[in-house]
Amino acid sequence: MFSSGAGDLFQLLRDGRPRTRSELVDETGLARTSVVNRLAALTAIGLVTPTGTAAASGGRPAARLMFDQASRVCIGIDLGATHGTVGVLNLSGDVLCQESRVIDIADGPTEILTWAVNTAERLLAASGRQQRDLLGIGVGVPGPVEHSTGRPIRPPIMPGWDGFDIPAFVRRRLIATVLVDNDVNLLALGERATQWPAVDDLLFIKVSTGIGAGIILGGVLQRGSRGSAGDIGHVQVPGTANDRDLEATASAPAIAAYLSRDGAVNIEPGDVTDRIRMGDLTAIAAAREAGRAIGEVTAMCVSVLNPSVVVIGGQLGVNVQEIIAGIREVVYRRSIPLANQHLNIVPARGGSDAGIRGAGLMVLDERLCAAAVDELIEQLD
């Protein structure tokens, strides 16, 4: 027997397929009166809407109802170390509009979040929406986060952010639920939803100013007890000088520092990709070696977690094939054979909006779950 709540009935409709009341009766096993009452409640809170009629063999055609994906919106905010994106999404997680700019996360939470909130308000207005249409706001930041509070926990590349109450700051102007997570976790959610929806076990590795991983196992994002699951950037890499950690060995700043070591040129982290594209043999070799270092840590993750897919994203992960080549070389050699037998290691394909998509999905998963929908109905009463 199907669960009795309206929120449970709504979960069936989230696939976007229109259904008649009779079809829902057959699908759920509920009495017709129960289905009618639950649909009325879902319609009252704006989540379900009529959409035409179904063909009938005789008598009056039956009305069809479906999930109203345009009834509300959510906001996704993706903050990296050097780049920020804000977007408005519908209830299916489709991006309606977005805006990006170069940022420096070290400028601190007040400056960065003020820009993000200003941009969100402007995009909300541009999409013809008001705050009452806002279901929630998802925020990604480049460091460990205590998900239950939305506060960063000793983030290594985010000076001034430790313990900062991000939800409270955002809610000063945007009155809605605010959820915060590590940016790589949200990239993992966005990449899986758009590129690998049938894959339940996925590891997303971001290689950029920092290095981190998002872990999805059994279709569920894994955050760990304190939000540090996937914080591989500070894992020591065997065989490096003084057993340096992964970020100090293979991140964009680490490669730039290596290329600038003799003082003849000063390479910035953002220039690394260009040097490789120009055919700089030293830069190419450094990128390949960085990929091997990342591969050492990834091989351990693959052996322990046994994902079906490893996605390599971030500024270097997507744009520098030598990084992925180095990762593949080591992972297939060093991880246990059973774990890598059918393993795919691929560049990210979700595009520049994967982070805000993931932020939106985080909001939708929490605010449109069965219990949350039932709560919305109770509030209406």
PLM regions and their residue ranges:
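ATP-binding/phosphotransfer module of carbohydrate and carboxylate kinases, centering on a glycine-rich
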Residues: 1-53, 57-132, 174, 239-381
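Short helix-capping/turn signature of helix-turn-helix
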Residues: 15-16, 194, 208
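Short glycine-aspartate micro-motif
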Residues: 74-78, 134-138, 202-206, 212-214
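Short, acidic, Ser/Thr-enriched surface-loop or helix-capping motifs
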Residues: 90, 147, 216
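Hydrophobic "anchor" residues
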Residues: 95, 152, 221-222
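Glycine-rich phosphate-binding loop and adjoining helix at the ATP-binding site
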Residues: 100-201, 322-333
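Short, active-site-adjacent cap segments at secondary-structure transitions
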Residues: 144-147, 185-188, 212, 222, ...
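Glycine-rich phosphate-binding loop of actin/hexokinase-like ATP-binding domains
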Residues: 198-250
